[in-house]
């Protein structure tokens, strides 16, 4: 019987903690539910103490108690009274006049101490309910429905809208099963209406967010039409929201008004929100007068920022200047309900200071900051919107807005409005007025001073006045050391002066102050590119690309870095991303064509060059490449079209007209080629190359004009020799350049024309022709071929003997023409 009683041993004194975790299982309350004896005691009156009917005699303390079994000696306690729980032979019994609960006469016969009557065995348990009973099934089904609704809401909050809808549908199906089962077991009055309402409302909400508006409206109709649901009429506002999304403005307004009628007047906030929705619907429907009525009512009952802002927009839409002013004044008088004084510690009490510091950045303070930022945004936007129209000029309008703001609780916004006024002047190309306003602001307090100086620095930088830009950048930095825009402007001025290392330091400082300053990150990438630190530049642009995913400038810079790193495949890949962002940029398309040309993919290069030409047909380099491409493929007529366009774009460049004539000659149209050469000679009478081509072509065609052109060529060459001698006498070393120039001209006359021999672009040859500065002198590089020795072989129209004759060096053997007139 005593196996459940654990007594601490008296002799074991070595281990102080022995038996520390031992306890009497009687006191294990967690197992009481499974304790049959305890459950019997709870269900019955077994073991309860009877009411006390006598008092303990005072003599019981001093004399032993005699029983029917003989006199026993009592054990005195430390306070002089007998211990009530111990007798001889280890059998315990009460030592009071009243028998305690759990003590019987059986204890005197050697029974163990059993206060809970565990020796009697477990009592018969109460009849348990069957798990498959209808009530248990209903409870279990209710639990499952609630869990499905919760899971649907959680999935919606996590952004998994499809899963949320599926869970809501499952909850609806199980709820209908639950209703049918409950109707079979109990009366209809016992149906859980709250559960039905929550299931239907959640299902309608999930339909709405999944843009299944018809199903959502049907579900809301089921709720609204059921008179058993209290306050279901407010859901008509949700139905109005759905109609608003569907742009069914008349029905949206109808349901908003029905919801408004069912909201009691004491619920003022809800009524205000519904009226705001009505106003927004009227604005989207273009009914500004009706919207004005709604917002005017709101501003008279409970003015708020959104209503005041929308009211200003409505008056702007109908063009009422005076009402615009009044609406703006109402907007700036809306109370913010922000107490700034509570964030200032009034005493030196450390506890108070600690509390003040704790609430300076708590959630409530963050909400107040967001509310203030929203108010400033609405006021600034409204001022910029109405300032150009409320007065005769936008300057007067801004002045009126500034005066009104200065007299309100938003005094600090007045300076921001002045800066916006300067920006407006810049948009109107009035540079001087903008600078004057910013210079006035630059003399005010530090915050405005820094902003004004930053803008002035940017203006002077764009005007190439780097000294003034640097000066104002210094002022801005000194006024606010943590202004990233000021540090970026200072870095720009240093960058313009070529000190790239110092510029990088300013950009780094700007990034340390504001890690989201994309301008500084972009500029530091350009700086590293200038310093030829390409890996670091690439890291900067890749970081910027992670922030600005669709920035064409950043993508182009990454492609440019890969090109500098001699990785054309990666450069092409990034340029393709640029084209996906801005598919009509001719510069990017021409760059792609250039890279494909370097890789030897002429077909892809032609595709992108042609696309670039379509979007911008005035790019000389693109026209030049396309002309060379058609020459390579021997489509002379196509090449003529591009060179003629180039001659229109650069009429002072003789090389384009010479190229046109050369293409005519190669296509076999000698008469057209001769006319083109003659026309070129009339425009550029001192061009040596044109005269040489005329002499050769007229001689081959047997024309009498050959003698005249030969005399002009001889006279022109003599004049050129005299000019070169004068240059040589005044400057040393010019003779070598003259020899190089003459040798180049003579060598070109005898060489075959090939625009792409050995992979060379035509531009390398065309640049050898005279430019705009020296239109009549021969070039120092290869010139356009003037001979008839053609790499394509003999022309079909010409006999073979003529082709052989052209190869002969004595083509111009004529007694009237001197050898000095022939091209070397």
From Swiss-Prot:
Region Disordered: start-end pairs: 113-134, 724-824
One of the record's GO molecular function terms: kinesin binding
Polar residues: compositionally biased ranges: 748-757
Cell compartments where the protein resides: Cytoplasm, Cytoskeleton, Microtubule organizing center, Centrosome, Centriole; Cell projection, Cilium; Cytoplasm, Cytoskeleton, Cilium basal body; Cytoplasm, Cytoskeleton, Microtubule organizing center, Centrosome
Listed Acidic residues bias regions: 809-824
Keyword Repeat: yes
A biological process term (GO) from this entry: positive regulation of cilium assembly
UniProt feature, compositional bias: Basic and acidic residues: 797-808
Keyword Cytoplasm: yes
Tissue expression per record: Expressed in the heart, brain, liver, lung, kidney, skeletal muscle and pancreas.
GO cellular component: centriolar satellite; centriole; centrosome; ciliary basal body; ciliary base; ciliary tip; cilium; cytosol
Principal subcellular localization: cytoplasm
Keywords of the record: Cell projection, Cilium, Cilium biogenesis/degradation, Cytoplasm, Cytoskeleton, Flagellum, Repeat, TPR repeat
Highest taxon of the lineage: Eukaryota
Pfam families to which the protein is assigned, alphabetical: TPR_12, TPR_16, TPR_6, TPR_8
TPR repeat feature ranges: 197-230, 233-266, 272-305, 307-338, 415-448, 450-483, 484-517, 518-551, 552-585, 586-619, 620-653, 654-687
Function: Positively regulates primary cilium biogenesis. Also involved in autophagy since it is required for trafficking of ATG16L and the expansion of the autophagic compartment.
SUBUNIT field: Component of the IFT complex B, at least composed of IFT20, IFT22, IFT25, IFT27, IFT46, IFT52, TRAF3IP1/IFT54, IFT57, IFT74, IFT80, IFT81, and IFT88. Interacts with IFT20, IFT22, IFT25, IFT27, IFT52, TRAF3IP1, IFT74, IFT80 and IFT81. Interacts with IFT172. Interacts with IFT57. Interacts with IFT46. Interacts with IFT70B. Interacts with C2CD3. Interacts with ENTR1 (via N-terminus). Interacts with LRRC56. Interacts with DZIP1. Interacts with CCDC38. Interacts with CCDC146. Interacts with CFAP53.
Family matches, as PANTHER family: INTRAFLAGELLAR TRANSPORT PROTEIN 88 HOMOLOG
Name assigned to this protein: Intraflagellar transport protein 88 homolog
Organism listed in the record: Homo sapiens
Gene (UniProt): IFT88
């Amino acid at each position: 019987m005593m196996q459940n009683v654990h007594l601490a041993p008296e002799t074991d004194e070595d281990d102080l903690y022995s038996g520390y975790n031992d306890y009497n299982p009687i006191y294990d309350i967690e197992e009481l539910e499974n304790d049959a004896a305890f459950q019997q005691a709870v269900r019955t009156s077994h073991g309860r103490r009877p009411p006390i009917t006598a008092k303990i005699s005072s003599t019981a303390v001093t004399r032993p108690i005699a029983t029917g079994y003989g006199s026993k000696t009592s054990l005195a306690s430390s306070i002089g009274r007998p211990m009530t729980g111990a007798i001889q032979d280890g059998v315990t019994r009460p030592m009071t006049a009243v028998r305690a609960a759990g003590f019987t006469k059986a204890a005197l016969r050697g029974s163990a101490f059993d206060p809970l009557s565990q020796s009697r065995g477990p009592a018969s348990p109460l009849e348990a309910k069957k798990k498959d009973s209808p009530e248990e099934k209903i409870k279990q089904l209710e639990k499952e429905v609630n869990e499905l609704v919760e899971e649907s809401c959680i999935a919606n909050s996590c952004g998994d809208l499809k899963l949320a809808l599926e869970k809501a549908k499952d909850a609806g199906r199980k709820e209908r099963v639950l209703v049918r089962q409950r109707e079979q077991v109990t009366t209809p009055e016992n149906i859980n209406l709250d559960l039905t309402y929550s299931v239907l409302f959640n299902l309608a909400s999930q339909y709405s967010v999944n843009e299944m508006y018809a199903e959502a409206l049907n579900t809301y109709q089921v709720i609204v039409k059921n008179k058993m649901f209290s306050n279901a009429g407010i859901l008509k506002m949700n139905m109005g929201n759905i109609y608003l999304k569907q742009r069914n403005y008349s029905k949206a307004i109808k349901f908003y008004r029905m919801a408004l009628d069912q909201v009691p007047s004491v619920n003022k906030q809800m009524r205000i929100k519904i009226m705001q929705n009505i106003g927004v619907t009227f604005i989207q429907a273009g009914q500004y007068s009706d919207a004005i009525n709604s917002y005017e009512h709101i501003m008279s009952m409970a003015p708020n920022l959104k209503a005041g802002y929308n009211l200003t927009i409505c008056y702007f839409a109908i063009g009422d200047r005076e009402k615009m002013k009044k609406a703006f004044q109402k907007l700036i008088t809306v109370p913010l309900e922000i107490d700034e004084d509570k964030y200032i510690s009034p005493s030196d009490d450390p506890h108070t200071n600690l509390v003040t510091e704790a609430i300076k950045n708590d959630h409530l303070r963050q909400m107040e900051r967001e509310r203030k930022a929203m108010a400033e945004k609405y006021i600034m936007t409204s001022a910029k919107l109405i300032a150009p129209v409320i007065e005769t000029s936008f300057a007067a309008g801004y002045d009126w807005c500034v005066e009104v703001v200065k007299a309100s609780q938003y005094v600090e916004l007045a300076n921001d409005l002045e800066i916006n006024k300067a920006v407006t002047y810049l948009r109107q190309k009035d540079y001087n007025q903008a600078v004057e306003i910013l210079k006035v602001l630059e003399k005010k307090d530090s915050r405005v001073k820094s902003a004004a100086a930053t803008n002035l620095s940017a203006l002077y930088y764009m005007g190439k006045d780097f000294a003034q830009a640097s000066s104002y950048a210094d002022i801005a930095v000194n006024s606010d050391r943590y202004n990233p825009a000021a540090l970026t402007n200072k870095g720009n001025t240093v960058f313009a002066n070529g000190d790239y290392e110092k510029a990088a330091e300013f950009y780094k400082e700007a990034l340390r102050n504001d890690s989201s300053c994309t301008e500084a990150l972009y500029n530091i990438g350009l700086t590293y590119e200038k310093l030829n630190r390409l890996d670091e530049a690439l890291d900067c642009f890749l970081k910027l690309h992670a922030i600005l995913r669709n920035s064409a400038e950043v993508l182009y810079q990454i492609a440019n870095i890969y090109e500098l790193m001699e990785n054309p495949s990666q450069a092409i890949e990034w340029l393709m991303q640029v084209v996906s962002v801005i598919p009509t940029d001719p510069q990017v398309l021409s760059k792609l064509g250039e890279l494909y040309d370097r890789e030897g993919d002429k077909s892809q290069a032609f595709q992108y060059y042609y696309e670039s030409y379509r979007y911008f047909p005035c790019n000389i380099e693109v026209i030049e490449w396309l002309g060379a491409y058609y020459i390579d493929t021997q489509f002379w007529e196509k090449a003529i079209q591009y060179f003629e366009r180039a001659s229109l774009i650069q009429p002072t460049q003789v090389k384009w007209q010479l190229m046109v004539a050369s293409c005519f000659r190669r296509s076999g149209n000698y008469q057209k080629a001769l006319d083109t050469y003659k026309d070129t000679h009339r425009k550029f009478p001192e061009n040596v190359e044109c005269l040489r081509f005329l002499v050769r072509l007229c001689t081959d065609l047997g024309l009498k004009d050959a003698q005249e052109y030969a005399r002009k060529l001889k006279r022109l060459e003599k004049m050129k020799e005299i000019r070169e001698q004068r240059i040589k006498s005044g400057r040393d070393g010019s003779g070598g350049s003259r020899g190089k120039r003459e040798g180049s001209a003579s060598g070109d006359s005898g060489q075959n024309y090939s625009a792409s021999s050995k992979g060379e672009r035509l531009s390398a040859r065309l640049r050898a022709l005279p430019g705009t500065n020296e239109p009549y002198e021969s070039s120092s590089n290869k010139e356009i071929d003037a001979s008839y020795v053609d790499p394509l072989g003999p022309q079909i129209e010409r006999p073979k003997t003529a082709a052989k004759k052209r190869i002969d060096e004595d083509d111009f053997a004529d007694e009237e023409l001197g050898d000095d007139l022939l091209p070397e």
